[in-house]
Amino acid sequence: NRGGGLLDPKNHFILDLRQPLLDKGNVDVLSEINVEAGWECTTCQACTEVCPVGNQVEKSDEIRRLEVLVEGKVPQEYQKLFMNLQESGNTEGRTDSPLADRLPTFSPDKEYVLWLGCFARYELDPNFTKSVENFANILDVAGITYGVLENEHCSGDPANRLGDKLTYNMLREHNMEQLAHASKVVTLCPHCALNLEKEYAKYSEVNYDVSHHTQVIAQLIEEGRIEVKKGSNGKVTYHDPCNLSRMLDEVDAPRTAINATTDEFFELEESGRNTLCCGAGGGLWWKKETTGRTHLVRAEQVVNSEADTVVTGCNFCYGMMNQGLKPLTPEGRSEIQVKDVADLVSE
């Protein structure tokens, strides 16, 4: 609710249920909580991270699952999203991908599946396409073989977080078949990485290893397989993606890569596992603006930090930073550059 939204996790998901449970012993969850506020949860797990008694407050997707599967209630903004996922296997209802067409196709003799995800595959932020190509170039320079799947579907993250478990399992089963001959998967999307590695494993055995692209880049730097030069990006800071830092517990690899490219790196006010959510998780990227979003709070922190460049390791964070910084950058000040870790290293 730092962005001005309705959601207050402690009150809406814990205290609103405590007294009715004490009074009645058994309650109808949907009648006792503010369901509208539940749809604003980004599932970033910040509330769980700081909860002193370890309540898993972030499990709002369970509340949304009740709304979707039991009540059949889906906010209008998500109805088209669910239809696209069910009919086309991706969030945008697309069948074409110019980016995928330009990249090598995966075959079992290649080391990595380069998993694009819907954001990159269908260019939800066209600027991010260059980040994917920069990472592919890094792999080429290091002599690593890779390819994209011809029939990659959405990892299912939006359906999973928004409560549509039937659609999620349909996507999961399809992707598991597509990955049957893969031993290693690398992706620029922490949301996809989380699902491909940890969420899928809740349903069936996963026979491939999943890496985030910053982990691969950091390893290549440490092994001396790529030469990285200091760039001219001015003062550089890093926005930790929630899925990467909290859910995948990766905060070191991006910094290893960034520090190889600059001597002017500094931390933001909230960083590491204590990062501030960009506001796009939990399917909210596809939700129309209602009240506020935390990406404006985060963008203001970046502006006030006097950074020249803000780096991130997530496609959604990349898009939200671009959206948030433009209206908040003071007139007369140079535009703050938003870059992926791969962009810095590729330069």
Regions found by a protein language model. Give the residues of each.
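Non-transmembrane accessory domains of multi-pass membrane transporters/channels
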Residues: 1-7
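Iron-sulfur-cluster electron-transfer modules
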Residues: 8-200, 220
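Sequence-level motif detector for i,i+2 pairs with an aromatic at +2
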Residues: 109-110, 208, 233
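Cofactor-cradling patches in redox/metallo enzymes
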Residues: 121-212, 243-347
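Acyltransferase donor/substrate-recognition loop-hinge adjacent to the catalytic core
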Residues: 218-235
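Hydrophobic alpha-helical positions that pack around
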Residues: 238
